[in-house]
A protein has these predicted regions:
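P-loop NTP-binding module
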Residues: 1-199
Length: 199
């Protein structure tokens, strides 16, 4: 999903934009932006467990095409309790602080259906963009999202379908499979700050 806000930046020239990596299970923003993530790098998860940290000190400036436009708060070390952290008062307070400094804040989250982490984030969003990929996303996800809309859990909803091949017929078919996997494991005995991605 991180590719969606990055694409939108093309239309936000001159605006102050923050991208928050709130997928605390399988963070990918660093890969998309070419940032070499280390397991002990502080980020969102660090700020949510340690109120003494200064949020602004852990926000990165993006160079290259989006220099001067995009700031990023990376996910930080993978915690054992992502849903709890994202639903905490600490996260609410952090957003209240950051929104004073930015015109737009994008929150990249884990897939709604597979984990509960993203559910608490919905209440903060003015717009929820749900990203699906042709020949990739399981069609069984649709009823779940539709129920959230029907139950008014989502206020404003946008659906993005990407990966469509021009002239191909495959996107009319629905034999999709969702391939979201977690390349890590929890190590409760090691305390906070662990991680398997040391690249």
């Amino acid at each position: 999903a991180a590719s969606i806000p990055i694409r939108l930046l093309e239309n936000l020239s001159g605006k102050k934009v923050l991208l928050i990596g709130a997928d605390l299970r399988n963070p990918q923003i660093h890969n998309i932006l070419g940032y070499k993530r280390k397991s002990k790098d502080k980020g969102l998860s660090s700020l949510l467990v340690d109120s003494a940290l200064n949020p602004k000190a852990h926000i990165s400036k993006v160079m290259g095409s989006f220099e001067g436009t995009l700031d990023v708060l990376y996910s930080g070390p993978i915690p054992p309790n992502p849903a709890e952290l994202l639903g905490s008062k600490a996260f609410t307070d952090l957003l209240d602080l950051l929104k004073n400094d930015y015109d737009y804040i994008f929150i990249d989250s884990a897939p709604l259906l597979l984990v509960s982490d993203s559910i608490p984030l919905i209440k903060y969003a003015d717009l929820v963009l749900y990203t699906t990929r042709a020949d990739y996303t399981d069609k069984k996800i649709a009823p779940f999202v539709l129920k959230l809309i029907k139950d008014k859990e989502i206020k404003n909803f946008g659906l993005v379908l990407n990966g469509i091949k021009t002239g191909a017929r495959s996107y009319y078919q629905y034999g999709y499979s969702y391939r979201y996997s977690y390349a890590y494991q929890y190590n409760y005995g090691y305390g906070y700050g662990y991680g398997s991605d040391d690249k």
